Amino acid sequence: LLADPPRERADAARNRLRVQEAAAKLFREHGVEAVSMDAVAAEAGVGKGTLFRRFGDKSGLVAALLDDKERDLQERILSGPPPLGPGAPAGDRVRAFVAAYTDYLVEYLDLLRVSETASPGARYRIGAYRFWHRHLAILLAEARPGADADYLAHALLAPLAAEHVTAVLRECDAARVAAGLTVLADALVSGPAAG
């Protein structure tokens, strides 16, 4: 039997919230890469030791800021209304996921880029990536019986990498990115039969 995780002390919870609010404010105002952990600690009114013990480094702080946003999208996928949530055909759910994830990606692009590039291969070790991949693989297996759904899920997630989208947005706007990703999703779910 697993024990419940230890409860967070009230002062630790207050400090965590202060740090996250300070980081979100500074990141919005100056961009994630321009803000130091020292600046976050000063803005939050906590010591650097508190910040580093709690989050480790900037990528850990970014991951904490993304956590609630990722959980929200995951909940909408698992139990929200169709077509993103259950109850729609698999192909429609794939298209809805690509649209919802593109919106999420564009809104939190700087945070996602830092999280996904914290170390080589970091994107693929993030629990959220594994969730997105598994979700798409299940839907693609249903939409394209006989196709290599596992690989196709990776292929569909590849152009959704934050670093890639950052580079593409230098050349075109978010609407064009979203339209192109929709075409890719359509091709995967409506393409020729596997074989």
What are these regions (language model features)?
Residues 74, 92, 96, 103-107, ...:
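Amphipathic alpha-helical packing segments from all-alpha helical-bundle domains
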Residues 62-69, 108, 112:
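Alpha-helical DNA-contacting segments of helix-turn-helix folds
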Residues 104-107, 111, 138, 142, ...:
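Amphipathic C-terminal alpha-helical segment
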Residues 45-55:
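Short hydrophobic/aromatic patch on the recognition helix
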Residues 64, 78-107:
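Hydrophobic alpha-helical connector segments
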Residues 78-82, 113-122:
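Short linear capping/connector segments at secondary-structure termini
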Residues 1-30, 34-43, 60-63:
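Basic, helix-initiating cap at the start of DNA-binding domains
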